Each structure stands twice: as C-alpha cells, then as structure tokens.
C-alpha cells in the first residue's frame, strides 16, 4: 500500500510540473502575429511583382507636355456584366481581378490616348499595348535618359500633381531631327501616372536606373533606416487612448488658427484645388478671398497602426470627426455680352461655402525612403455636409437647382482628390541642398551632373590664341583683318577690296558690331545712289552676314567671298535700278504709254505755240482790220485786246468748270468717251491752227468772192466790238457766221471747204431715281 502510494506520488510529481508548464505554454499570449504584422508589408497597398520587375501599371507617355491639362490615367474596376463598349473614350483591357466579395471585375481605361501598360525591368522601360497587355510596343533604355520634373519651377509640395510630369530628357535629342513615325526612341518623354501617389512610385523606379542616378538600387535607401529604434518607439505606445493626441492637436490649433499666416496657407491650398474646376470662357479664375476656420477642431478616434515594412513603409489609419462651422468665400467675374449693338457688362460672382460636418476613415501613408512626404486619403467616400450660398452682384440666389449643382461639383472635387486611390500629400521636410527634388538624398553618394558651360577663361584663351585681347576695338579688328589679307598674298588691301572691276564705286569694307554684339561687314560706298539702294535692300544683304561662334574666328577667305557677294548684289541692284518700273503690277506697262507721252508733249507744245500764235495773230489783226486813219490809238487797241484775253480765259475756265460738273453728275462716263472727246478737241485745234497760218488779207480775192457782193457794209464800217468779237471767235477755233451770213476774212477756197467742228457732246448716262422702299407693315 505504501509502495503503491510512493509510486503514484513520484510519477504524479514528475508529470505534474510538465503538465502545468504545458498548460501555461498553451494558454499564454503570443506576439508572433503582431511581429509578422509589423514586418510583413501590407499586401493591399503593394502590387505583387516579379522579382525582376521593379514596378508595373498603366502610365501615359507623350512627346509633348500637356500644358494646363491633367495627364492622369483613369483606370476603373468594373464588373464584367457591366462593361461598356470599347470606343475612343473607353478601352476594356484584358486584365481581370476578383473583388473580396467574389465578383469578377475587369479594368477599363478612360481616355486611352497615349496610354501604355508599362514595366520597369533591368534598367529598361517596356511599353505594352494598354488593352492587350502582353503585346510589346517599345523598349526604352533608361540609362540614356535624365529623369527630372517638368516644369522645373514647380515647388516641392506640387511635384506629383496630375498637371506636372516626370520628364525623361534625352541628351542628344537636339542634334537629331524628329522622325515622322510614332516611335518614342531618342526623344524627350513626359510620363504621367494614375494618381499622384502612383507617380511618386514611378519617379523612384525610373530614377533608380536613369543616367544621373547610377548609385540608387532597388530597396536601397540613400538614408540608413534604423528599424530597431523605430520599432521600439512604436511598441512603447501601447495605450489605445488617444486623448493626448487630440489635446496635442487642439493646443497647436489654438495657437495658429487666428494668425494671418495660417489663413494664407489655407487660402493657397483652396485656390489650387479650385483651379482644377473647369469654368466657362466668360468667367475668370476663381480666387479665395476670405477664410474662417471657426473654433472647432477635428477629433481623432480609433487610431490604429496598420503595418511597417522592413523597407520603411508605414501605414496608419484613424477615424476623423469634425463638427463645426468652417467657411470660405470664393469670387470670380463673368463678362456677359449682349450683342454687337450693346456694350458688354462685367458681373461679379461670389460663392460662400460652409462646411458643418465631415466624418470618415482616413489612411496615412509614408512610403519607403527616399520619400519625404505623408500621403493621406479617405478609404471610402466621407460624409459631408456643405452649405452653398451663391451671390450675383451682391444679391444672394435661392435657386435650388443651381445650389444643388454647385454642391454636387464640390463633392466630386473632394472625391477626385482625397478618396482612395487618389491621395493628397504633404511634405514633412524639404531639403534644399539636395541635387534633385522629390525626396531625401545622401549628397555624398548622389551627385547630379551639371551642364557644362563654356567658361570665360576659355573664351579669353581663345582670343589670346587668335592674337587679340578681349578689349579689342573695331579699328584694331579691321587692322587685324588687313594684316591677315596681306599675309594671304592678296594684291588689294582688305579695307579696299573690289571684286568686280566693272563696278565703278569703290566699296570700303569694314567690320562693325550689330545691336546683338556680333561682327558684321559693312560697305561704305562713294556713290550716293548705291547707298540709297543698299539702304533699301538692307534686309537682303543682312542675310549674307557670316555667322561666327566667336568674333575672332574670322578668316580672310570668308571675308573675300562675302565681299564678292556684296559687290555682285550691288551690281544687280544697280542694273535693276535703271530698269523701268512696272505700273500697277502689269508687265505690259513696263514704260510710259505712248498716249501719255503724246498728251504730255501736246500740252507742252500747245502752251508755247499758243503764245507765239497769239502774238502773230495780234499783228495780223492790226494790219487787216484796223485802219491807219482810225482814231483808236495803239494803247487803246492793246487795252481792248487785254480785256478780250481776260474774257477768253474766263470763258475757258467756265467751260472747264462745266465739263467737270458734267463728269461729276455722270460718274459712269467711260474712259473711251473722254479720250474721244480729247482727240476731237485736239484735232479741231490743229485744224484751226492751219487756218490761222493760211490767213492772207487779199483784197482782190475778197472782191472776187461772190458772197462779198451781198455785203452791204464794208469792213471799215464794222464797229470795233464786232471786229474784236470775230477775232475772239477765230482764236477759240469756233468761228460763227457774220450777221450778213458770211465768214469773215476767208478766201473763196477756205470759205467753200472750211466748216467749223462742233464740240462733241458728252455722253451722260442718266440714272433712274431711287424709289423709296415702302415700310413693312407691323403684324
């Protein structure tokens, strides 16, 4: 009995302790899952890639920068039973996924222009077809490109905006002509991602294999990451209570929420967000003019540490709750036009937006180094309560349709900006000493090459090599060229070189500086005509200026050939100047027409001929009509003839006025009628001149004239006024019949053949009077 008890006691004592230890080990809490949760990366946020592939996904690659446009790639997961038809706006890809609820989805690309499915592998960028993702189109070697951001003036907080691009600069692109094909090789490329956060991943992947970053390798951070110390700090924060965090945020907000600097920061952020809204052409840019952040602060609840990878990627989630009255006022102007008959009017438009409630689950992400920013976004669409108050010309509008439309646009803007997968970023540190933007870099290991520019000392050495200093004047340069020309066995001095012996004026070729600072050759000619021609054709000769990268690399052979070209141009201009100019652009009228010359010569001759004829006519009238026994003195006769001349000039002037008035009232008179009238008048004048030359006061011929028998009065009985009247009629070329029916002072032959030419009538085209349009009766 005792022996049995001893055995049972020994066996029970031996097994009891191991049994207790086994129960303890079985029931004790373990941290294995937590350790794995911290170390292993989150599979939801990282893409499962092959070992050799650094990154893959859809990107937009263009050869031109999309100025003022968003280049983001819109990719959506749509169930297979709801897929749209493929078109220019939608492209259904062959990539499929399965949602957590078991629904088969397929990727659809919105606006697939210039979109590729790309991978970065072994230092090369492979671009596949966006729909058939296994069809390779282009392969780009990243080692030949420089990876920077475009535009280069963008700030650190706006690097990964959808309107900015990752610029792949090909160094030799300026030396090669762009091909007409769609090939992307040897060209500058602009890369856009799906989201700003996705663009950062592509930037690091492209930068790691680019020409300017040979030291960066995958999963190698430029700054050492102390994982042990970070893990210790995280495990020390084991309390789930977040009151301290809310108190900390509230204290900071209490100190800055009423400062002008904080308001300016909020205004700048809101203005950039509102600038993404497309406005009509009649409206100007939207500006935020006032901000009121209120007194309440957002509270943080349910702060949860999600994961921390061994590469340094941190993910934290939290629930945000805000209840307050935050408002801001935006303003713009609209230029309204009322037609061409009324002036346009500028109407001020204002919009007051008040945020009273927002709540949702937020994700905070810090990517592995060298990332220097915090990415934040809502997991799902947050609950928002907005109050919109539109105002036009200081008058508030109460149209519900307009208010709902504006509210919907603002909610869509929030969803496109800070709802997954779209994330917004905030740089927590900016290193201005870093060679490039977009991260934290080790300057000692990372050296960006700089574009070498020709140093000033190299230019001075080049000038010394040419035998001239930097302060050489124009005269010394001319002497230097003269010296070079004499050394080249040229017989003519360089300052007086004549290329053509037939060219008479000697050209003085000198070097002068133009307004751009370059040296040009000028020719000072002794002939003033050629100077004028040269000044008129300065634009033609300016094209002949020799372009030199350095003003001291000027050779005599180039100057001699250029001087010959200048002389040939001057000779051509000289011969061209002597050619008759074309009139009205008609090649058939290269010279003055014969009609124009004839009219000019007739007008010139008729003036002097008229003076001589008038003098001879006065002498003949004195000898024929005026009796020697007349009581009229020579002075009286001359005064009478001067008075008659005045009357003749007045009559001619009146005829000219009548003719001009007639032409004024008949604007449709043809040019041929004017020419025929002038020809008839000229022929009548010529015939009258012949009559004056043949005038012969023969008394016997006058007596033999049968018409003279019927004359009852003699010539001596004629009054002086009648004789002057007849003389005036003969001078004007329109002789009329004598009161007794005879022609005065004409012989028988002239009286039988001569008939006065009547003045040709002017062809006047009468116009029908314009009849007034009857008014349109009102309906």
UniProtKB/Swiss-Prot annotation:
Pfam families: MMM1. Keywords: Endoplasmic reticulum, Glycoprotein, Lipid transport, Lipid-binding, Membrane, Nucleus, Phosphoprotein, Signal-anchor, Transmembrane, Transmembrane helix, Transport. Residues 454-539, 573-592, 654-779 are annotated as: Disordered. One of its GO terms (cellular component) is membrane. It is found in: Endoplasmic reticulum membrane; Nucleus membrane. InterPro entries: MMM1_dom, SMP_LBD. GO terms for molecular function: lipid binding. The modification Phosphoserine is found at residue 473. The chain crosses the membrane at residues 3-23. Glycans are attached at residues 233, 489, 536, 640, 660. It is a single-pass type II membrane protein. Residues 238-429 form the SMP-LTD domain. Residues 484-494, 660-674, 733-750 have a biased composition (Polar residues). Residues 1-2 are cytoplasmic. GO terms for biological process: ER to Golgi ceramide transport; lipid transport; vacuole-ER tethering. Residues 454-465, 675-691 have a biased composition (Basic and acidic residues). During endoplasmic reticulum (ER) stress or when cellular ceramide levels increase, induces contacts between the ER and medial-Golgi complex to facilitate non-vesicular transport of ceramides from the ER to the Golgi complex where they are converted to complex sphingolipids, preventing toxic ceramide accumulation. The SMP-LTD domain is a barrel-like domain that can bind various types of glycerophospholipids in its interior and mediate their transfer between two adjacent bilayers. This is Nucleus-vacuole junction protein 2. It comes from Schizosaccharomyces pombe (strain 972 / ATCC 24843) (Fission yeast).
């Amino acid at each position: 009995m005792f022996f049995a008890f001893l055995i049972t006691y020994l066996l029970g004592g031996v097994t009891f302790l191991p049994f207790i230890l086994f129960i303890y080990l079985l029931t004790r809490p373990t941290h294995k899952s937590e350790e794995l949760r911290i170390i292993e990366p989150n599979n939801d946020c990282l893409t499962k890639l092959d070992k050799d592939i650094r990154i893959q996904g859809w990107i937009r690659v263009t050869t031109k920068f999309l100025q003022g446009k968003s280049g983001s790639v819109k990719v959506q997961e749509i169930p297979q039973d709801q897929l749209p038809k493929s078109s220019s706006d939608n492209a259904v890809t062959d990539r499929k996924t399965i949602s957590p609820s078991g629904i088969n989805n397929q990727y659809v690309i919105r606006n697939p222009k210039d979109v590729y499915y790309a991978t970065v592998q072994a230092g090369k960028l492979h671009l596949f077809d966006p729909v058939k993702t296994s069809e390779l189109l282009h392969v780009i070697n990243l080692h030949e490109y420089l990876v920077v951001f475009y535009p280069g003036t963008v700030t650190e907080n706006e690097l990964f905006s959808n309107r900015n691009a990752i610029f792949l600069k090909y160094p030799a692109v300026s030396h090669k002509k762009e091909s007409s094909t769609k090939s992307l090789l040897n060209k500058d490329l602009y890369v856009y991602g799906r989201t700003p956060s996705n663009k950062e991943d592509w930037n690091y992947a492209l930068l790691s294999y680019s020409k300017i970053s040979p030291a960066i390798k995958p999963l190698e951070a430029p700054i050492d990451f102390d994982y042990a110390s970070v893990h210790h700090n995280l495990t020390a924060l084991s309390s789930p209570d977040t009151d301290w965090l809310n108190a900390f945020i509230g204290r900071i907000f209490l100190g800055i929420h009423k400062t002008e600097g904080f308001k300016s920061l909020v205004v700048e952020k809101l203005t950039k967000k509102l600038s993404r809204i497309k406005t009509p052409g009649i409206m100007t840019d939207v500006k935020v003019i006032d901000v009121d952040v209120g007194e309440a602060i957002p509270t943080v609840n349910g702060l949860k540490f999600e994961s921390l990878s061994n590469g340094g990627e941190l993910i934290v989630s939290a629930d945000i709750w805000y209840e307050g009255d935050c408002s801001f006022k935006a303003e713009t102007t609209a230029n309204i036009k009322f037609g061409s008959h009324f002036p346009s009017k500028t109407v001020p438009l204002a919009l007051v937006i008040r945020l009273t409630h927002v709540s949702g689950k937020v994700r905070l992400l810090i990517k592995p180094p060298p990332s220097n920013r915090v990415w934040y976004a809502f997991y799902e669409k947050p609950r928002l309560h907005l109050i919109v108050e539109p105002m036009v010309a200081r008058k508030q509008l109460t149209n519900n349709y307009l208010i709902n439309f504006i509210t919907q646009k603002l909610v869509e803007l929030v969803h496109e900006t800070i709802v997954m997968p779209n994330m917004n970023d905030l740089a927590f540190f900016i290193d201005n000493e870093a060679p490039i933007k977009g991260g934290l870099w080790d300057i000692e290991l990372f050296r960006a090459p700089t574009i070498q520019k020709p140093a000033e000392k190299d230019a001075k050495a080049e000038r010394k090599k040419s035998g001239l200093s930097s302060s050489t004047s124009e005269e010394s340069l001319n002497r230097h060229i003269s010296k070079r020309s004499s050394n080249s066995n040229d017989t003519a001095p360089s300052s007086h070189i004549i290329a053509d012996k037939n060219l008479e004026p000697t050209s003085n070729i000198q070097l002068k500086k133009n307004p751009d600072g370059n040296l040009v050759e000028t020719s000072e000619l002794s002939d003033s005509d050629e100077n004028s021609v040269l000044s008129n054709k300065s634009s033609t000769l300016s094209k002949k200026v020799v372009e030199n990268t350095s003003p001291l690399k000027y050779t005599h052979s180039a100057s001699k050939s250029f001087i010959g070209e200048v002389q040939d141009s001057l000779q051509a201009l000289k011969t061209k100047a002597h050619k008759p100019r074309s009139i009205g652009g008609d090649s058939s009228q290269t010279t003055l027409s014969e009609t124009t010359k004839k009219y000019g010569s007739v007008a010139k001759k008729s003036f002097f001929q008229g003076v001589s004829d008038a003098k001879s006519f006065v002498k003949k009238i004195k000898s024929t009509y005026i009796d020697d026994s007349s009581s009229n003195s020579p002075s009286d006769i001359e005064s009478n003839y001067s008075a008659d001349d005045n009357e003749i000039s007045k009559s001619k002037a009146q005829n000219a006025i009548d003719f001009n008035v007639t032409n004024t009232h008949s604007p449709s008179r043809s040019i041929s009628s004017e020419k025929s009238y002038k020809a008839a008048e000229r022929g009548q004048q010529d015939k009258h001149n012949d009559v004056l030359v043949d005038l012969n006061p023969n008394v016997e011929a006058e007596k033999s004239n049968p018409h003279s028998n019927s004359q009852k009065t003699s010539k001596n009985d004629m009054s002086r006024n009648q004789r002057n009247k007849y003389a005036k009629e003969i001078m004007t070329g329109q002789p009329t019949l004598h009161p007794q029916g005879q022609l005065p002072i004409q012989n028988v032959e002239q009286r039988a053949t001569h008939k006065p030419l009547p003045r040709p009538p002017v062809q006047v085209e009468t116009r029908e009077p314009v009849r007034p349009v009857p008014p349109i009766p009102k309906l």
